[in-house]
Regions:
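Extracytoplasmic beta-strand/coil segments of soluble accessory domains associated
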Residues: 137-176, 196
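Short strand-turn segments of transmembrane beta-barrel domains in outer membranes
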Residues: 207, 217, 222-255, 266
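Flexible loop and strand-edge segments within Gram-negative outer membrane beta-barrel domains
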Residues: 271, 277, 282-284, 302-362, ...
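Transmembrane beta-barrel wall of Gram-negative outer-membrane proteins
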Residues: 24, 243-270, 280-320, 352-372, ...
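Short acidic/polar hinge/loop motifs at secondary-structure boundaries
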Residues: 138, 175-203
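Gram-negative outer-membrane beta-barrel transporters
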Residues: 601-605, 609, 614, 622-710
Length: 736
């Protein structure tokens, strides 16, 4: 495959012969709503240093052009940007229509490229520079509707409209992240300092990134070349008080006018024990290292680019979370706050996580005249996760969990974008995964050896119905095949009835254990439609989607102690695919003095795969809660809100809130790990004459989550009586 890919790339990048360069492109730029000319619009040729401004009559002229194919970029300060392909064989006259509206910085953005309009919420690199003390998931909460599921000082996952893990896709530099996202304690392997910008994709277009994005898609924007000889270097040093954390980040970028570009970004972050009001929390330090290198060559109608990144994190886990006997477990879970132990130190000991992630990709594109743009991409990822528990003797140096996941991905898509009022895009993608759990740990493997093959294809279309109305639609189908090798205890295999339902999976019977080779296949179909209305700063988008999600390996095969979670997790071979039906409405208003955004949603998920507390298990290593993957029907209902008032060009006030309710319909009970009602308020003052200087005063309040499942009533052999294990109880509301 790699030789075919290299051959295609070499064909894509073959240079064209020199031509006579005396042609012109002239025309007008018109306001799409009222037909009036737009003055000051930038008309440029993508990939070349040719750009002009439209005059007061909206007219422009580009001169000295060769015969050939060009992509014309038209933009205006108050409008979205368009990219229009043109085949130039003679002097050409064109009229371009721009949708004139006031955009609010870092709020709901209307992004238009080749008439591809999709509602997204965005944050740029400047926002992330102010969030360097936080991890990636925490920084994402600047986007309304994203909360976090936080299980440690440096361990947090994005939680979108009540769902997380495999239901929220993270697309990094055009690559879907494969970093064992199924674990609640598995944070995204992305350094906050490496992010150029992030957008949240919802609606029909989001199906391009995957058919299982029940919550949505978090898209990390790739670096864009500037097509001129330039270089830029930036250095950031940040420190923060809790944990005496420090972070250093360096970035260098180099661009050439011929479209070549390259860069390098590196960062290092270290913090010691955090503290609460009573004292230091032992073993809550962290250490992170990241480096990324983008490079490539972009022209107007063809290009190639590559990206390589490495991320490594050593995250301490609160020492108190290491459980001994049952009474220890009850005391720790029922306690209001963790008991501080020890003094401040940067040392990180067991229990801890040691995680690394490598990502590499190469992609190429070619724009065919009068047809569209074809893109090919290959990517590789390797994720290593080691989880260390407190063990005796030399075994303390060995991880209790040692997992490696390799992913090879290939994708191809074609975008038919020669028409102004419609767009069609289709593509295929495939991924092959090899999962290896190292048996040298001496501990039963939580997730077995498996190979996972995914194949997906999608079709997307957009139609401009009128200057104010647009319709999007997409369909997608995916096929998933998982082949595993796993040992089961004979007693458990029989108790679950697997000996009857899955007898063909048995390879060998070793009396007390059974070696099996499960082979499971799932075919999923997804569809989504989005209708957009936009006029005079008001925008309403309605999204209707049906999504099927195949179970992930953890939901199927988990069996054993998940060390970083300090619990036993059990999967089920009987898992069926989820079926989610979602209706979401987004309304936004943008004006010079204020912006407003509100988004109610309802998501009905049949056969929802939930990890539920189910009891306790006593082992030679102590007592641990048992959590089981179970299927039920679920309703997720919520609303996200954000309002910003601009008092002056430099002073603004922002208020936001998120509410989500989740109900287990079969058991008429709430789900665990659902975020409470949260609000935030921020007063921000920038200084026009001092570039880069701003002051923010922010407060966040999280209410107490009262809608939780019932706690477990267990028998305590030490006291010889039943005792309540408050495993689902939520903390009181708090203000930060």
């Amino acid at each position: 495959m790699k030789y075919i890919l290299l051959l295609l790339m070499s064909l894509v990048l073959t240079l064209v012969n020199a031509q006579d360069c005396h042609f012109i492109i002239q025309g007008k730029v018109i306001d799409q709503h009222d037909g009036k000319p737009l003055e000051g619009a930038i008309v440029a040729i993508y990939g070349l240093q040719k750009e002009v401004f439209s005059d007061k009559n909206g007219q422009f002229i580009l001169q000295g052009l060769c015969q050939g194919f060009y992509e014309i970029e038209i933009s205006h300060i108050d409008c979205g940007t368009q990219f229009i392909p043109i085949k130039l064989e003679k002097n050409t006259s064109k009229t371009f229509y721009l949708e004139h509206h006031v955009e609010a910085l870092n709020e709901v953005a209307l992004i238009k490229k080749a008439t591809n309009l999709i509602v997204q919420q965005t944050i740029d690199a400047t926002v992330f520079e102010n969030k360097l003390s936080q991890n990636f998931a925490e920084a994402l909460t600047e986007i309304q509707g994203i909360n976090t599921l936080k299980t440690g000082n440096a361990i947090a996952k994005p939680l979108l409209q009540g769902v997380y893990g495999s239901r929220v896709i993270t697309n990094n530099q055009g690559v879907r992240m494969q970093d064992m996202e199924w674990g609640a304690e598995h944070a995204p392997n992305i350094a906050t300092s490496s992010v150029e910008g992030v957008s949240l994709a919802v609606g029909a277009k989001a199906l391009k990134y995957g058919g299982d994005a029940v919550g949505g898609v978090i898209v990390l924007d790739p670096r864009k070349p500037v097509f001129k000889n330039s270089q830029k270097h930036s250095a950031i040093f940040t420190t923060y008080t809790n944990g005496l954390g420090v972070l250093s980040s360096q970035k260098f970028e180099k661009d050439f006018e011929n479209g070549l570009f390259y860069g390098i970004q590196a960062s290092y972050k270290k913090a010691g024990n955090n503290r609460n009001a009573a004292g230091y929390l032992q073993n809550t330090g962290l250490e992170q290292t990241s480096i990324s290198i983008p490079f490539g060559w972009h022209l107007a109608h063809k290009g190639i680019d590559a990206y390589i990144s490495y991320f490594k994190a050593n995250n301490g886990i609160l020492r108190n979370s290491h459980i001994g006997n049952l009474q220890d477990l009850i005391n720790q879970i029922n306690r209001e706050t963790a008991i501080p132990i020890g003094a401040f130190t940067y040392n990180i000991e067991n229990p801890r996580q040691d995680v690394s992630h490598v990502l590499a990709k190469i992609s190429a594109y070619y724009h065919f005249e009068d047809l569209g743009k074809w893109t090919l991409q290959y990517d590789f990822q390797q994720n290593n996760r080691k989880e260390y528990d407190v063990r005796l003797g030399d075994r303390n140096k060995l991880p209790g969990t040692d997992l490696q996941l390799q992913t090879h991905g290939f994708q191809s898509n074609f975008k038919l974008d020669t028409s102004y009022d419609k767009l069609i895009e289709f593509g295929i993608e495939t991924a092959y995964q090899i999962h290896f759990p190292n048996p040298a740990t001496g501990v039963k493997r939580l997730i077995p050896d498996y190979n996972n093959l995914n194949f997906g294809t999608y079709l997307y279309g957009l139609k401009t119905l009128s200057p104010s109305w647009e319709l999007e639609g997409s369909i997608r189908t995916d096929w998933v095949q998982i082949k595993a090798d796993k040992f089961y205890k004979t007693s458990r295999w029989t108790a679950l009835g697997y000996n009857t339902d899955f007898s063909d999976f048995i390879v060998s019977d070793f009396d007390t254990q059974i070696l099996t080779a499960p082979e499971l296949s799932f075919n999923t179909q997804s569809a989504a439609f989005s209708l957009h209305y936009n006029n005079l700063g008001h925008r309403v988008s309605t999204h209707l989607q049906y999504i099927e999600r195949a179970p992930n390996p953890a939901e199927l095969f988990s069996e054993g102690l998940h060390h970083s979670a300090a619990r036993i997790e059990l999967g089920s071979l009987r898992m069926k695919k989820e079926k989610a039906q979602k209706l979401a409405v987004q309304y936004s208003y943008s004006a010079a003095q204020r912006t407003f955004f509100i988004a109610p949603y309802f998501n009905r998920i049949n056969d929802y795969m939930a990890l539920i507390p189910a009891g306790l298990e006593f082992t030679i290593r102590g007592a641990f809660p048992v959590w089981e993957y179970q299927q039920t029907n679920a309703n997720f209902t919520g609303i996200d809100f954000k309002w910003t008032e601009y008092f002056t060009d430099e002073l603004k006030f922002t208020n936001g809130a998120s509410i989500v309710k989740a109900l287990d319909l079969k058991n008429n009970s709430p789900f665990p790990n659902i975020p409470p009602v949260s609000t935030h308020h921020e007063l921000s003052q920038s200084f026009k004459h001092i570039k880069g200087l701003s002051v923010q005063l922010r407060g966040d309040y999280n209410f107490r989550q009262n809608e939780v499942p019932e706690d477990l009533l267990i028998f305590n052999p030490y006291t010889q009586r039943e005792q309540l294990l408050e495993i689902n109880r939520a903390p009181n509301g708090y203000f930060l």
